[in-house]
Amino acid sequence: MYIAGVMSGTSLDGIDVALVRIEGSGVESKVELIHFTTVPFCNDIKSEIQQALSIENSNVQLICSLNFKLGLCFANAVKEVCKEANFSLEQLDLIGSHGQTIYHQPKQDGNRIPSTLQIGEPAVIAYETNTTVISNFRTMDMAAGGQGAPLVPYSEVILYRDPSKNRLLQNIGGISNVTVIPTQQSDQNVIAFDTGPGNMIIDEVCQRLFQLPYDQNGEIAKKGVVVDEILTYCMSHPFLKMNPPKSTGREQFGEEFVSELLKRFKKHSKENILTTVTMFTASSIVHHYKKFILPYYEIDEVILGGGGSYNSTLVEMLRNGLKDENCTIFIQEDIGYSSEAKEAIAFAILANETHHRNPSNVPSATGAKQSVVLGNVTFPPI
């Protein structure tokens, strides 16, 4: 089957689309990446997403309209990846669309029950591409008592399991998440959870203090020094004390967190603040390894993916934090994969599993009561 996996993450970099060929289903699936592209959001759409994400500035009228606008954006991104690959849209069998997360409530909070909302209307995508769309992957896991995240572990088992090596798959997107893939294990024995912020705080600080969308290659952070009082404040966040399975998002590490941090520590230089929040991402990852993983597994390899794997300062901080653990750190490209395409490929794989009516959540990672078939299916008009 030819499947387009579509992902728009918490970093708001744009729409990632992976055109993938998949043979079979389940853990024996054969997956081939044909082409990958990222279609940037235009400034107006990005601004509307940011407004929709803000509890203070969002409104139902905006979200209703944006749902359809993003559906059209996602459809156009699928057309673009096919065009770049010289691949006929008519040959496409399926689209797996994650959507844009607007709010994610993994646990009960007062009268707010666990819930999640991703937008990017699948009917618009199906109509514009004349292709079946599978979307809303997180909701069935949450209906089964899970947190709806992380969902990539199933695909990581398919792509990265090794009979002789214990591997950690560390994704550093807006949020960071880790998957433990032991030797000779089935997906139900996989451990996976969010480790905290990835690029989210780094990017927000960059935008506010340097008027830059992100710290390219970690060049600015390389110039500063870590401020202990800021790092101590960050590392005291309640999320770091929670036991897995757990997930987090912009609600905990977004604009409000950064506003409070900059207000508290405004006396420090811009460079030192950026260096310290970069260290916070690295330290939160290392903290979770040492508390929840390394006491139980001897890890042979750590494989980094996501946009954060291109931040050499962050990667060096991780290497230093793990220097005594006798494990080798790679990035996706070192082993023949793409850091950028990883999550889009994951949702192509999940769409394939849903098409075959196979469960593809990992209850040991999400906390769900059982394995479930993920996603809603939207058929094309004809």
UniProtKB/Swiss-Prot annotation:
InterPro entries, from UniProt?
Anhydro_N_Ac-Mur_kinase, ATPase_NBD
Q: Which family does it belong to?
A: Belongs to the anhydro-N-acetylmuramic acid kinase family.
Question: Which pathway does the database say it acts in?
Answer: Amino-sugar metabolism; 1,6-anhydro-N-acetylmuramate degradation; Cell wall biogenesis; peptidoglycan recycling
Q: Which Gene3D superfamilies match?
A: 3.30.420.40
Q: Quickly give the catalysed reaction.
A: 1,6-anhydro-N-acetyl-beta-muramate + ATP + H2O = N-acetyl-D-muramate 6-phosphate + ADP + H(+)
Which superkingdom? Bacteria
- GO molecular function ontology, one term from the record: kinase activity
Please indicate if the UniProt record lists Transferase as a keyword. Answer: yes
Q: What does this protein do?
A: Catalyzes the specific phosphorylation of 1,6-anhydro-N-acetylmuramic acid (anhMurNAc) with the simultaneous cleavage of the 1,6-anhydro ring, generating MurNAc-6-P. Is required for the utilization of anhMurNAc either imported from the medium or derived from its own cell wall murein, and thus plays a role in cell wall recycling.
Q: Which HAMAP family match?
A: AnhMurNAc_kinase
> Which positions does UniProt annotate for ATP binding?
G9, T10, S11, L12, D13, G14, I15, D16
What is this protein called in UniProt? Answer: Anhydro-N-acetylmuramic acid kinase
EC number of this enzyme: 2.7.1.170
Q: Which GO terms describe its biological process?
A: 1,6-anhydro-N-acetyl-beta-muramic acid catabolic process; amino sugar metabolic process; peptidoglycan turnover
Q: Name one Pfam family in it.
A: AnmK
Print the keywords alphabetically.
Answer: ATP-binding, Carbohydrate metabolism, Kinase, Nucleotide-binding, Transferase
